[in-house]
Amino acid sequence: MKKKTKGLKTQKVPWYGRRLNVYLLLIGVTVLVYFRVFTLGYTMLDDTIFIKENQEYNKSWSNIPVSFQRGLFNPTGDSYYRPVFLVDFIIESKFFGTSPAGYHFSNLLFHVLCVLLLYFFFLRLKIPDLTALILTLIFAVHPVLTQAVAWIPGRNDMLLMIFFLSGTLLTLKYRETPKWQLLVAQFLILLLALFTKETAVIIPIIILAVLKIDNGKWKTENGKFNFLLLLSWALALVIWFLVRSAATLKPQDFTLTDLLVNGFNRAPVLIQYLGKIFFPFNLTVFPDIRLIAPWWGVAALVLLIGLIIMSRSYARPLTWIGLGWYILFLIPVLVVPASLNDQVFEHRLYLPIVGILLVIGQVSICLSSMIKDQGSRIKDQGSKTKDQNPSNSSSNSSSALRPLFVQQVRQGVIVFVLLLFSGLTFYRIGCFKDPVTFWTAAVDGNPTSAYARMMLGLRMTEPAQMKQRFEEAYRLNPNEKMLNYLIGKLALDDNDIPRAERHLKKELEFSQIPDNYFNLARVCFLKNIPDSAAFYLEQVIRLEPRHPQANHNLLLLYLQLDRRDDARRQIQAMRDKGLEIPPEVTGRADLQP
């Protein structure tokens, strides 16, 4: 006998509750906003180092383990340790070679993956479907994250986010189903995160806080579960520390006091970054903390505090987790010494911005609840009034419409913000089109940077324009590394020997550039000081042993100076290096060993 179903109603699932619809929307919006990245080239800010200059390094699979034993930019004289980043370029070089388009494609792919993982993460935190979708869309199109996606080296922050979110999702799954496979998987992913960026040491703190909440409230976890998880994290940290300690990195001479002083001096960055999240109108590709107007940040801070108080979301744990998330992931930016990096690049907000989105999500949930409660009260009050005085029905109807109006206004604001952010991001992608465009934007956004003007000068094709940019940079900072070398090289090309010598010698105070020594050798040769020329050529070979022209010229110079023993040693050294020896030298009997 069939059961009667007449009168039963099935609740219709809204479009944002259908997962496939949401996935397609998130992917579609992200690709639509960022499709311009396929037209981008290099910026000449580190990207060519990892792809072009490291071309030989990237060719060999055997350099994958080597990447865990060296620094990022230099095998021995570097403070940055990013082995996963180097390994990524080794792998991708097999597919893309030195074509920037392929690396821009993978950057976009990483961003899409981060967007999807973030949406899953919000849902796992029991954030309502529509709120999770809106927060994820804001992340996907936010202008402050443009550099992370459009600038090829910005991928490191995206890789860290991928490992962080996937590891957190696995840990949350392990809480529900404590299988050893999940425990091992999250352990391996944490290791990858640590070898991606040192910031990953903060990840266990954030995950612990997330594990302590359930349906928006604090809870106590099983002791055995926590012990196994903590043990796996401790093991990952020990392995990372030991491997990193064995790497050939440049020793750091700053103390804990130095880090604390740096953190105090750079604390305004927290407010400046907050301003860029809420009001992304003062963005630049090469920012300087001293030039960023504080007012946007102060306004954003006041707005955030006001929203938290007004919505009473301060009672929700995720609000505090979000604030802690934002601050903790920015600590490395605060304490990094200016000698290592003095720029407050916007791609570093890729992970911290999620903390602010969590706070905004809690504010939204609380405000929605307040509007819903207000609507229910008005409806109940209207029903009572109608029973008592039917003539006031029109007044009751207008009161009931108020929550609906507020809801419509909020929806309009969300759509406007998403469209505005998408437009700003679409426009900003163009700043990364090519070196001239990028460094022009850098100078416009940071006019006091000698480095930016120097790099723009290097991109100029006309010597007069190049010279003008170098002179502008010199007026800003005569001690800028590499600048005196470039000015001296131009002066040498113009046959201005005294000026060339002055600048080339000054560069020795700041750097050890092989070509700088080579040009000093040219100066000495033109001044007919062969002994000094030989000295500078020896320095070139010390720094770059296989420099062909330096080896060739030094050999001929030894012969000119009648330094036959030195000439014999130089001939043998060139043979050992596989360098060609001039034919007029090889046949001389007096130079045979």
Question: Which role fits each region the language model picked out?
Answer:
Residues 1-9, 13, 373, 380, ...:
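C-terminal luminal/periplasmic domains and tails of membrane-associated envelope-modifying transferases
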Residues 2-372, 392, 396-464, 471-486:
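Polytopic membrane enzymes that build or remodel cell-surface glycoconjugates and lipids
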